[in-house]
Amino acid sequence: MINEIKQDSEKRMKKTIEALHTDMSKIRTGRANASLLDHVMVDYYGSPTPLSQVANITTSDSRTILVTPWEKSMVAAIEKAILNSDLGLNPATAGTAIRVPMPPLTEERRKELIKVVRHEGEQGRVSIRNIRRDANNQLKELVKEKAISEDDERRAAEAIQKLTDRYISEVDAVLAEKEKDLMEI
């Protein structure tokens, strides 16, 4: 029972870290990143389709994303979709390829993004703490039902606390790296 609670907690904490990584990848730094366009939807013959399903997305250098549509007829639709996304990007068509230069971030925008990043990090920490609280409540329930002893509960709570500390430090590391990326010019 105790192991199941620990495993469930660890699985949920891992998912929190994965979600944090996903959220952080959506935040634009000054550097080109192909995953930045993952959430752009293109009108593909009347149905909204993710850009990654109608084109090849690569980074040609640290400041440019290169989008190569699989169908020549999609160039205009892809360009329009990138323009209409809230990413503040201005694509330029060069034949059948679309170059998306990354504009440099202003100091004001960097500070704004750092606030967003810190908020996301805090959400991650809160989520991990909530998972710890749930696990501790489950342990207390088991003690009430006399399924485990108080000593077992204390040992399990300490193990869950170590798990919590490990994942919170992981959140802090992700946060520090994203802040460093944002402050690089």
UniProtKB/Swiss-Prot annotation:
The disulfides recorded in the entry are none
Keyword presence, Hydrolase: no
The identity of this protein, by name, is Ribosome-recycling factor
Main location as per UniProt: cytoplasm
Which family does the record assign? Belongs to the RRF family.
**The keyword Cytoplasm is assigned to this record:** yes
The protein's gene is named: frr
This entry's Gene Ontology molecular function terms read:
ribosomal large subunit binding
- Cited PANTHER family: MITOCHONDRIAL RIBOSOME RECYCLING FACTOR PSEUDO 1, RIBOSOME RECYCLING FACTOR
Q: Name one Pfam family in it.
A: RRF
Q: Where in the cell is it found?
A: Cytoplasm
| Gene Ontology, cellular component aspect | cytosol
- Report the SUPFAM superfamilies cross-referenced here: Ribosome recycling factor, RRF
Function statement = Responsible for the release of ribosomes from messenger RNA at the termination of protein biosynthesis. May increase the efficiency of translation by recycling ribosomes from one round of translation to another.
Write the record's keywords in alphabetical order, separated by commas.
Cytoplasm, Protein biosynthesis
Per the record, the GO terms for biological process are:
cytoplasmic translational termination
Q: Which NCBIfam families match?
A: frr
